[in-house]
Amino acid sequence: MDKLELVNDGLNIIDFIQKNQKEIQKTYGRSSIQQPSIKDQTKAWEDFLQCTSGESEQVEGGMSKDDGDVERRNLEDLSSTSPTDGTIGKRVSNTRDWAEGSDDIQLDPVVTDVVYHDHGGECTGYGFTSSPERGWSDYTSGANNGNVCLVSDAKMLSYAPEIAVSKEDRETDLVHLENKLSTTGLNPTAVPFTLRNLSDPAKDSPVIAEHYYGLGVKEQNVGPQTSRNVNLDSIKLYTSDDEEADQLEFEDEFAGSSSEVIVGISPEDEEPSSVGGKPNESIGRTIEGQSIRDNLQAKDNKSTDVPGAGPKDSAVKEEPPQKRLPMLAEEFECSGSEDPIIRELLKENSLINCQQGKDAQPPYHWSIERSISPDKTEIVNGAVQTADRQRPGTPMPKSRGIPIKKGAQTRNIHLLGRKTCLGRRVVQPGMFEDHPPTKKARVSMRRMSN
């Protein structure tokens, strides 16, 4: 073939490619590259296995049997001993024919399929009061030996350990099984879940907390009147307008002790009977409906009306002073006396009692200015503030009160307390309508309450 013919063939090939470009790209393009078919893969594996088993026409090294006088290794001339007797001999194939007699790959005949069964009241012959045996049962015999529940969704497990159940355990009743269950951490008094008609609550059984908390206590030790439900009446919400909306505090279920409140009393609403020694019943009354505190009544009787404390101008009448109840040291018995805030409150309480005996006008507000060191707390000389003045730079929050009607009078009890430990609510220093607390005092009291 001369050069001219080669050039013509090349031109013809180029012309053919240009005319059939789309078909060629579909057949030989990059998109057609994929894995070989299963048939090709099977043929390749068969060729490879024949090479490794010595049954092909090609031996090691790639030499053929028809290579002439080249010295090669003849596999048929080797000894035909099996490799199990410790002798190096004939090469044995690593493959095994699947349809060849008894050499099919299968499970070990020693391994049996077992199922774990648990009598949960599903079997007719075994209930809660008879033979609650649990364990593994052998299914190789193909027959039910009477100790197995034929559950449709039973899971067949292989290689599972077989637990031997003695005859005594098979005859054990549930009453004697409680001790064994309690030692393993299970609840022996737990009852199975039963469907109940929610539309008819009268038929519901009483709730027993031990069934849900797993305390291991027998049912007869718990009375039917026992209730572990949270009393919703004891949960109350306390907030203030000067705080963020998301900082809400709740009382816990232990809120059964006393609590102090701030009572809004205007001078003209003072009862004349309170001067004569009759205690004001609205002061010291707890929100939970408890009895009136005796010690608050005794201290309240000391503060009587004074001629010098008459009505003032109209601006003061619009904002009546808030009468502060005395702080009690017993409210801080759980927090410790080393807290600087507690020491300040105790000092303030003692000064209030002394001032009530000396001055003719009862004090309404006290301002405590704390220094950097909490041990060197000093009280400002001009601590007594009038009702028409407030701390500079602090906004006056709106009071949220609950009106309590008694006779013809209506008084607002402002919930300005904050919880401490043991469910007690303590009045913060400066938490009044015209005397809001600073941010530092709020953070300190929040830490003490937590």
Curated annotation (Swiss-Prot):
One Gene Ontology cellular component annotation held by this UniProt entry: host cell nucleus
Chain segments carrying region Disordered: 53-92, 265-324, 384-403, 429-450
Keyword Phosphoprotein annotated: yes
Bias type Basic residues, positions: 438-450
Any single biological process term in GO: amyloid fibril formation
One Pfam family hit: Soyouz_module
Keywords for the protein's UniProt record, in alphabetical order: Host nucleus, Host-virus interaction, Inhibition of host innate immune response by virus, Interferon antiviral system evasion, Phosphoprotein, Viral immunoevasion
Effect of P206L: In strain: Isolate Malaysian flying-fox
Residue interval(s) of motif Nuclear localization signal: 439-442
Keyword S-adenosyl-L-methionine: no
Coiled coil: none
Major location category of this protein: host cell
Subcellular locations according to the entry: Host nucleus
Residues with the Phosphoserine modification: S257, S350
Compositionally skewed regions (Basic and acidic residues) per UniProt: 63-76
Note: The P/V/C gene has two overlapping open reading frames. One encodes the P/V/W proteins and the other the C protein.
Subunit-level organization: Interacts with host STAT1.
Function: Prevent the establishment of cellular antiviral state by blocking the interferon-alpha/beta (IFN-alpha/beta). Interacts with host STAT1 protein in the nucleus, blocking it's phosphorylation by IFN-alpha/beta. Also blocks antiviral state induced by Toll-like receptor 3/TLR3 binding to dsRNA.
Protein name: Protein W
Species assigned in the record: Nipah virus
